[in-house]
Amino acid sequence: MITDPLLSVRNLSITFGSRSVIHDLSFTANEGEAVAIIGPNGAGKTVLLRALLRLIPYQGEIQWSHRARLGYVPQKIVVDRQLPLSSRDFLIAKLRFLKLPDKELEQVTTELGLTSQLLNANIGTLSGGQFQKVLIAFALLGHPNVLLFDEPTASLDELTEERIYELLHSLQTNRAMTILLVSHDLSVVSRNADLVLCLSKGKPCMGPPKQILTPEMLQELYSAPPQYYRHIAEHEAANPSADIPRERGRC
């Protein structure tokens, strides 16, 4: 039986010049867990992911188990709409770089429901949701068992956002993946996360959603009363015949 954590972070500190972004952060993540990273803007959520990927310098210890195979989906990639590259070619580039068999691309695109029409389309012409799915497919090539997501639904419409989160939940369930997810959506965090890691200018905190997502904790974290965005699925389950609410509350 495996007992050691997949990820262990000890006394992590990150500074940019004289500004401390993360100070003395320690936490662990185990196989199959979904860890949501929350906090106000500027708290260091994206910085933490970049440090976990060893893309930026840091002080302290970040230890990945030898079992960990990482995939990463950034918050945003700017693509020239005139770029003569199809979604399929974009994915094949990684396939060839990793020397993977062609069947893996077929398996991943089938699992994510990527159609031939989408795969053959110029990557610069895709909608936000379509491009996000392609980025997830890109991350899944190579059989990772850990996925790091930096606000995977930023700037997406409500329905597309819901579908992306359903997809992430399916990946965690069906593949027993460990997921580290930066999100401002407290509704998604409360429903899907096993653990919540709070980053703020004060002392970081970590625990299950019921322990962390309390009015008192969120008031301290955000210095404002928390608001939850009620998703389509939640609203329809409670009110099958009612109109979908249009207010979007987030922290």
Region locations from a protein language model:
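Conserved ABC ATPase "signature" region
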Residues: D102-L118
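Conserved ABC ATPase signature
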Residues: N122-L126
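Catalytic Walker B motif of ABC-type/P-loop ATPase nucleotide-binding domains
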Residues: L147-E151
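Helix N-cap at the start of a conserved alpha-helix in ABC-type nucleotide-binding domains
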Residues: E158-T160
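H-loop/switch region of ABC-family ATPase nucleotide-binding domains
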Residues: S183-H184
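H-loop (His-switch) and adjacent beta-strand-loop-beta switch element
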Residues: L195-P209
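ABC ATPase nucleotide-binding domains
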Residues: T214-E216, L221-C251
